[in-house]
């Protein structure tokens, strides 16, 4: 079978997973070309487009027109915006909507939104009829560079974030960089935390490039597409090595152990903290904790903080509005982290910028003492 032809102005990043490999297409105008791109790959399918109220208002009409032009029948399923939609209740609502539309296993669920919509929709696609086709159309910077790639899906519980879900790969990812122009500055900054993360994991050259070019990434120049594509390449390489997070893939959680604890502590209240902001603080804390453990030089931790501060991201616990619970309570949330194995704490720590590693059996007393110190740091 011949590979589908792709417009010249679109960057393609392959995700190599054997017979479950797929492409990430990155460029402007992909919302208007979505019907054409999907019809090339999944002939004769009907789709449920899962989106949130904000994205629906801004972009759904264009997307449904694109599908109609390609002869693709669409059932829109609209959920409330925000982290609170990553719940069992919303999962049931969306599942019932897909079943009510009589969509079959060979049809597709299309996630048209940010990370919440993508995680929720992928879970639905993975469990309805034991697995439907799945297409990611991420509309936030965070979802374009991170959550839409690699097949992680799921919902939150009262015990913590992303504790229930499945690995379920999409057949296609369409990342329209034009829709990022409609994001609020705060949403864009939050997504940028995940971009910076790739440099901090194992690409010091990329982090240095971001330090020099972040303003053009924010303003929407060619550097934006370059940053998104490079981030996707970084993630695709890790996912190809370790799809189900039994080893290296855990590196992608740099900043997330602390960050998820902060999200849980703030009740997933987006007026106080959104995911990318939690990750930004978490990455700064991971570097500071690495300094405390004599793994990393103070100058690298300060460089990370300086960059986060320059782009307008929070980097201290005191940056979380409304205060935080005591260190002991934060430790309770950390103990629920997915990377905990046989009760031992696992963190992604670093020996310097671009030198992150998986640290197992991290002493809880050291983490507790560190959190107490940072809670007192203004």
UniProtKB/Swiss-Prot annotation:
Main location, first listed in the record: cytoplasm
Keyword Amino-acid biosynthesis: yes
GO molecular function terms noted in the UniProt entry: 3-dehydroquinate synthase activity; metal ion binding; nucleotide binding
Positions with a binding annotation for NAD(+): 115-119, 139-140, 152, 161
GO cellular component, one term: cytoplasm
Protease as UniProt keyword: no
Pathway(s) of this molecule: Metabolic intermediate biosynthesis; chorismate biosynthesis; chorismate from D-erythrose 4-phosphate and phosphoenolpyruvate: step 2/7
Catalysed reactions listed for this entry: 7-phospho-2-dehydro-3-deoxy-D-arabino-heptonate = 3-dehydroquinate + phosphate
Subcellular location: Cytoplasm
Gene3D superfamilies: 3.40.50.1970, Dehydroquinate synthase-like - alpha domain
Biological-process GO terms, alphabetical: amino acid biosynthetic process; aromatic amino acid family biosynthetic process; chorismate biosynthetic process
Binding site for Zn(2+): 194, 256, 275
Keyword field: Amino-acid biosynthesis, Aromatic amino acid biosynthesis, Cobalt, Cytoplasm, Lyase, Metal-binding, NAD, Nucleotide-binding, Zinc
Co-factor note (free text): Binds 1 divalent metal cation per subunit. Can use either Co(2+) or Zn(2+).
Cofactor(s) needed for function: Co(2+); Zn(2+); NAD(+)
Pfam families from the UniProt entry: DHQ_synthase, DHQS_C
Top EC category: lyase
EC number annotated for this UniProt entry: 4.2.3.4
Coiled coil: none
PANTHER family linked to this entry: 3-DEHYDROQUINATE SYNTHASE (PTHR43622), 3-DEHYDROQUINATE SYNTHASE, CHLOROPLASTIC (PTHR43622:SF7)
Family indicated by similarity: Belongs to the sugar phosphate cyclases superfamily. Dehydroquinate synthase family.
UniProt xrefs under NCBIfam families: aroB (TIGR01357)
Reported function: Catalyzes the conversion of 3-deoxy-D-arabino-heptulosonate 7-phosphate (DAHP) to dehydroquinate (DHQ).
Protein name: 3-dehydroquinate synthase
